[in-house]
Curated annotation (Swiss-Prot):
<keyword id="KW-0028">Amino-acid biosynthesis</keyword>
<comment type="similarity">
    <text>Belongs to the SHMT family.</text>
</comment>
<dbReference type="InterPro" id="IPR019798">
    <property type="entry name" value="Ser_HO-MeTrfase_PLP_BS"/>
</dbReference>
<feature type="binding site">
    <location>
        <position position="121"/>
    </location>
    <ligand>
        <name>(6S)-5,6,7,8-tetrahydrofolate</name>
    </ligand>
</feature>
<comment type="pathway">
    <text>One-carbon metabolism; tetrahydrofolate interconversion.</text>
</comment>
<feature type="binding site">
    <location>
        <position position="245"/>
    </location>
    <ligand>
        <name>(6S)-5,6,7,8-tetrahydrofolate</name>
    </ligand>
</feature>
<dbReference type="GO" id="GO:0005829">
    <property type="term" value="C:cytosol"/>
</dbReference>
<comment type="subunit">
    <text>Homodimer.</text>
</comment>
<dbReference type="Pfam" id="PF00464">
    <property type="entry name" value="SHMT"/>
</dbReference>
<keyword id="KW-0554">One-carbon metabolism</keyword>
<dbReference type="GO" id="GO:0019264">
    <property type="term" value="P:glycine biosynthetic process from serine"/>
</dbReference>
<dbReference type="InterPro" id="IPR049943">
    <property type="entry name" value="Ser_HO-MeTrfase-like"/>
</dbReference>
<feature type="modified residue" description="N6-(pyridoxal phosphate)lysine">
    <location>
        <position position="229"/>
    </location>
</feature>
<keyword id="KW-0963">Cytoplasm</keyword>
<dbReference type="InterPro" id="IPR015422">
    <property type="entry name" value="PyrdxlP-dep_Trfase_small"/>
</dbReference>
<dbReference type="InterPro" id="IPR015421">
    <property type="entry name" value="PyrdxlP-dep_Trfase_major"/>
</dbReference>
<dbReference type="InterPro" id="IPR015424">
    <property type="entry name" value="PyrdxlP-dep_Trfase"/>
</dbReference>
Amino acid sequence: MLKRDMNIADYDAELFAAIQEETARQEEHIELIASENYTSPRVMEAQGSQLTNKYAEGYPGKRYYGGCEFVDKAEQLAIDRACQLFGAEYANVQPHSGSQANNAVYMALLNPGDTVLGMSLAHGGHLTHGSPVNFSGKLYNIIPYGIDETGQIDYEEMEALALEHKPKMIIGGFSAYSQVVDWKRMREIADKVGAYFFVDMAHVAGLIAAGVYPNPVPHAHVVTTTTHKTLAGPRGGLILSNDGEALYKKLNSAVFPGGQGGPLMHVIAAKAVAFKEAMEPEFKVYQACVVENAKAMVGEFLERGYKIVSGSTENHLFLVDLIDKGITGKEADAALGAANITVNKNSVPNDPRSPFVTSGIRIGTPSITRRGFTVEDTKQLAGWICDVLDNTDKPEVIEATKAKVLEICKRLPVYA
């Protein structure tokens, strides 16, 4: 018999210490990694529920195991809420991650060796959009498109490449692009060559749910997303479509049994919670503030003489190009980390350095906005970051900045 008062602290001191240390790090560091966010205690409650005990291969009403009548309810709630949130007719909430969701789309729509047009990783795309080190780059013939000299997606190049190579699928979406994507234009390009149009909206799903960024669902054959990042739910994936039953069946089969076995029912329940939270009025206010804060930070960086890729942001993230400053992304990452400010080094367009060093950093505002940073707080933070980047060789500047960070983190805790 299992006792309900069993806990990690009494049983596994080493693991408990690691968890406590990470909890403290999150509270005492300013999180600016664009793909990270803080999920609610309600989401974590669902993830820690007894639904983790249940195997449920298949889909609601069509399971391979008995005893699934209650997890069916949980999964159907997640499906219905996802459809309502994004204006979709179909949703699959079972992918364990965004990459798994993307893999399912490839499996459903393509054969190995088919040609795919995807955004270059060096210009802001994602590993699963055709990187040579990823399954997508190994199994398919990838033709990369990129951005122009202004930092905007080069739609003319994209169309020319599509007409030349006749891809079977065109991918829209990004991991490091700060502007608004013209989903309609991309669909028109896909239609010209008879290609599927697939959108990976993982980075901006929360903004889209709140109506502060254009929704690709009306334009794409299929859309995927993660359920964390700006959506602020549990780590997982989601597939959406409005393109008809024939495609829905292919997508379902590509997830199970094509790529996964049993779904994670506790995570699916947490997704249902997150989708409900994303329908609340305060979520819309939050997402609008995410964009306002990102714009405010960009303004401060520009005033301090820093180069921003594309010169502005229209979403939750932006890239700081450090080539002219004579410091690497790796050095900037380390210096800011010493001041309790967490960013990630990131390649910039035409970066002369390797992906392990880079010439830029990527900054995102979902996490700081979640903990209550205002525009004024965010401007102040941008100034602190510039102070550190201007003085990476001066420990006293880094220590002074760290003291300011600890003070504001105490004033604005993640979990009050």
